Amino acid sequence: MAVRQAATAGTPGPRREEEAALLFERAHYRHDPRWLLPVTPRLCLACALELLPDPGVSLVRKKHMLSCFQDALVRHTSLVTQLVSQDQRVCIHFISVLFGLLCSMEDGSVTDLCIEVLIQITTQLKLEQTIRCLLDECHKELCNMPSMRGSLATLTLLGKLVDAIPALADELVMEHGNLMEHLLRGLVYPSEGIQASVCYLYGKLYSSPVAAEMLSGHFREKLFPLFLSILDGAQTKELQINCLGLLRQLLKYDLFVSMIMNQDGLGESAKNIEGSSGNTSLPLVLKKLLLSRDETLQVASAHCITAVLVHSPAKHASAFIHADIPEFLFEHLSSSSEVLVWSSCNCLTLLVEEPLFFSKCHTVYGIEAVVRSLQGSLKMNNIELHKQGLLLFAEILTRQPEEIKLFTSSAMCRDAGRALQEAVSSPVLEVAAEALKATSAFLRKDHQSTPPVQYGELQALLEAMLNRCAEFSQTLLSRRPLGHASSRDSEKAILQRGKFLLSTLEGFRSACRLAIEFQSEPSAQENPFTAPSAKKEDTLEAFSEFLLSACDSLCIPMVMRHLEQTTHPALMEVFLSILHNLFVIVPHMKEKFSKKLASSSFIRLTLELKARFCSGLSHSALNQVCSNFLYYMCLNLLSAPEKTGPPSKEELSAVSELLQHGLPQISSRSPESLAFLSDRQYMEGAARQRQYCILLLFYLAYIHEDRFVSEAELFEAVQSFLLSLQDQGERPPLVVFKASIYLLAICQDKDNTLRETMVSAIRKFLEGIPDLQLVYTHHPLLLRFFLLYPELMSRYGHRVLELWFFWEESSYEELDDVTSAGQPALPASLVVLFQLLRSIPSILLILLDLIYSSPVDTAHKVLISLRTFLRRNEDIQVGGLIRGHFLLILQRLLVEHGASPSGASGNLPLLLSLLSLMQLRNVSEQELDSVAMKLLHQVSKLCGKCSPTDVDILQPSFNFLYWSLHQTTPSSQKRAAAVLLSSTGLMELLEKMLALTLAKADSPRTALLCSAWLLTASFSAQQHKGSLQVHQTLSVEMDQVLKALSFPKKKAALLSAAILCFLRTALRQSFSSALVALVPSGAQPLPATKDTVLAPLRMSQVRSLVIGLQNLLVQKDPLLSQACVGCLEALLDYLDARSPDIALHVASQPWNRFLLFTLLDAGENSFLRPEILRLMTLFMRYRSSSVLSHEEVGDVLQGVALADLSTLSNTTLQALHGFFQQLQSMGHLADHSMAQTLQASLEGLPPSTSSGQPPLQDMLCLGGVAVSLSHIRN
């Protein structure tokens, strides 16, 4: 009693009443306090043992006590466990009481509480005796039941107990075996609640592999047909769920799957069990559940189908397909439940492994659902759903038979492509990886052949795929871990990137394969529905070019970056097969693409792959891919070489066969290959072919600047190879010998030369070749190779130089532009040639022959090269060598084509141009030797055989003759003039040329006319000066000459200057030349008195000439102005000698003042121009004050005094000297101090260095015309 009071003391009223309800007042005072729970709720175990079985206690109170006990177990597990386990007998008794209460109560809530309390106590105590006691009670209860009507609570307890303690399953089966019979009774009892409990318990028993094995016979003989019928006829969700739970456990085992899917193996007793249905099959039952509207049942059904198929899709899928299960699974893909969609995808992924799935066209009807489901799921955040959907899509795309079209419309194909595009762009790597696999399967011809082929969509998909891969690669690179501790993570990241890159490349390879397959499909070339006038965009050609561009800009860089860290054979196999496919996809770009690959070291890369992975029989697939890639790349490079002739079809066919057999055999590293190439031992056919292949690979690599082997070692190896061929009496294929020569030339060190035996061997090989072009490769070092050895140069120098200039592509016109500022940099090829010319001048003779005998384009290149060489190497004296050889060429030409030299060779003008350049190159005056005199004779003879229309020959010839006259000593001038005057043909030609002066302005003869007039003036001066014999007189009409000056041609200032030069010479000779005769033009009027004095000129001609000179001076052309002043000086001298009054009259014309001041207005200090100074001197000499007054002379003197005389040219200073001398002689220098200052300034400058400006070159080529400035000026 005291204990009871103590327990209730100090508690509030309601709480005290609640705790009192937990105690059995009649007996509690007798109970030991140790049975009282020390915390709230204040339970007394002894009271519970007396209260719960007492029939006098209300059900509500008992329920309350059980609820509080359960709550205490949850909240104070350890205290309650200690309380119950104080005495094992008490514990067992308490369990018996609870079990008795469970079996006697019909109230479901009370039984549930009893079950929960029993389960918690049993699991918490973990006492074997307690568990065994409870199992015995349950077994006893079931055995004593006449009917299964009241077995629900016991069965439920057993099921939950086995669920809580899985090890009990084995014990129940082994020690309570007859319990199974009671379970079968429960299954046939007409209560779905009891059946659900039995199924639940069965499910827990079969979850144990040991129990399942022991119950296999029970299942076969008794349970299976009954269970399947119950599942088929189940009405309550509880029974359906528990049946499916049992089914899921059964389907874990192959044995039960075989039994369920193949009912033929069941015993007769099983088929005769009451309630069983022999016609019920699992696929039909599960199909029924799939058709239900309950999502849980649908998901469970899909899981069961999956569980069956996991064991063997090949055995069991057909049963589900025949039951039309796929149709309903496809329908569920449109569900809003992510779990159901995932389950359906998982199930379908297994079903597609069965070919029957496709033959029944399930994919054709279901692909739209798959695509839409994929599109919808990608908008969710369920990564597993993304992966499963993509996996299903990839399996369908991969396994769909080619003869059954999957996409029946282009719109559906487009939607599928866009869904994949979104998936490959996913930031989740696993999703993107699955999308890559699906993309690879999607890019199949039968999937894309529905017209029109949407190349634009395919391109967008590939771009997304490649960009995602590039982004992933960059992300890994930027997150590269530091330190040794992270090396494992780094290796994992590299491996992960390699797998992703491999999947990307496989997708790209599928696109390449698709492009190749579409090449034979006319309907796939472009969109057939495009209007004829519309721009065609979606074309196979554009798609193919995109593939090439994408590979070049994305695939190759990604693979090369990956190779820096690791090399994966499978990845490289796919990569090289892509490059191989691109040769076929874009055939018009295969040569260019091959060259780019070769220059990017892909020959080296492929050989290293073969050496590393393909030795022996390992990685045979990679070896084949590497060999195929090298084969096609080499053929592309050899069939379209850069600066060399392509091989013939026969050669290419032989090389093709050679590479096809030899490349798969090459798997050695570079040092081993060099050693094999150097082997001088006897070589069998296969070994020799392998040597040929190695040599060709080195050759192509070196051509494209991929020098991955030592030049010195390769140089020795090639020599040994050629000597080995010579020893065995073999002649290599032309392409192989071509490669050998090229490699020897490239690898030869400047200080290292070939042995005489090697040169002899090379020459013997060359002698068997009909044309050097067959083994020529354009390179400066190859040119050096042939010209360095006299034995080779004497035989092949001419041909190799001809080939070299033929293939040269340097900008020769730019080199020949002497007017450009500075000298343009020489190409490397010409640098080598010029070095050879400096060291071996005899090469110049070959070049001269080339100018004469080669095609015009080639000869023009040779000419410009020689010009450039001669301009830049003025210290090299090769003039005599060239002139002598040129003389021989010219003599041969005149002998062979004497009647018509213009038809001898189209390159003759080029030779003559070079000859004139050689003459111009002589800066100082030199005596003409015998060769020079012979050349003058031959050139004049050549000119005499030409007509005025042979401009190309005559222009350089006239230039040569003119410069020869003006660039030699006076004695040589006289001899040269005599030789030329003796050429009657030349004189007749000049007469014809002078008569053509008034031809049309646009005629190409203008430059030639300039040369003709200059030559005539020169001949006339030399003949008059030396009283030389004249063999042919030149007749010139004075009126025509004056007319040409009065009406000059447009842009023909030089022609006017040349005519004035001729007139000046004639005036100085007083028209008494024995060479030139002035003839009248038609009927002439009777001469006046003045005309008689001026004869042979008439006054009208004088006026015409003066007016012409004034008009020409106004043009302000420097050269023409000086020619005009010189002619005016000669005219006034001529007039002054015959009639001083007329001379004064001409000099004092008012128009002269206007002319002078027009010239003075040309700019600041224009009076210091030499022609103006000479003109003022002339007017001062004739005291023409009306033209230039004393005040104006003073202004000029003042300007001269202020000018910096050191900046003036020699010509200007000479004119200034003449001006001052004229003033002094006339006493016009009134200011003596100024005169003395100016005179001192002039005298202080030495004549040769009186100018700070560099002396102007006297001999020039203006507009193609040879000109001597001093000749025109003076």
UniProtKB/Swiss-Prot annotation:
InterPro entries: ARM-like, ARM-type_fold, Immune_Signaling-Apoptosis_Reg
Keyword list, A-Z: Disease variant, Meiosis
Recorded consequence of changing T408R: Found in patients with non-obstructive azoospermia; uncertain significance
Known tissue expression: Expressed predominantly in testis. Weakly expressed in spleen and thymus. Expressed in the ovaries, Fallopian tubes and uterus.
A GO biological-process term: meiosis I
Highest taxon of source: Eukaryota
Record SUPFAM superfamilies: ARM repeat
Implicated disorder: Hydatidiform mole, recurrent, 3: A disorder characterized by excessive trophoblast development that produces a growing mass of tissue inside the uterus at the beginning of a pregnancy. It leads to abnormal pregnancies with no embryo, and cystic degeneration of the chorionic villi. Susceptibility to azoospermia may be associated with MEI1 variations.
Role of this protein: Required for normal meiotic chromosome synapsis. May be involved in the formation of meiotic double-strand breaks (DSBs) in spermatocytes.
PANTHER family to which the protein is assigned, alphabetical: BCL2 INTERACTING MEDIATOR OF CELL DEATH, MEIOSIS INHIBITOR PROTEIN 1
Name the record gives this protein: Meiosis inhibitor protein 1
Organism of provenance: Homo sapiens (Human)
